[in-house]
């Protein structure tokens, strides 16, 4: 039997989810990618940071509750600067001030209940984005599986599942890790991306199947 967990993630200061194609300007996704949420769950559960095998057991959805204010700041990073032959350089980094998200995580009921307890009492300190981007996890609930057909959803939407008619953003988010089997070993060789429509609410051209979590309609 499966169940779905819903939790609220409040960022008290700021956070940033770097888009990897940027170089001198580190732009940010408007929501934490699926891989970032899995990292949060791994920290709560005490899973090894290089063990991604549990991703196959979970389906993850993200709800944008409050986008936060986007600002630009400068950060010094350690990198060889040829101009003055020092190990430093400045990059412009976008940050999101006090955004609020919700996550939905579906899986086997026992595992979901274990994750829910871990989010309330995490094994490691929790962050969202960079290691010093503090996050507060609130309102952790577990729901039974309940589906509905709807033209209005409250979560981000995989690009291939529907077409929004209201204003949205489209981003290609990291959703998992590519692995290669080498004998008895599995090595992680890259990152898998998927297109997502992103908005706080979406009105769609056609009804699609979604999960009911209280009043929220979520696509995983």
Please annotate each region the language model reported.
Residues 1-23:
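N-terminal, Lys/Arg- and Ser/Thr-rich interaction peptides
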Residues 67-220:
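Internal, well-folded beta-alpha domain core
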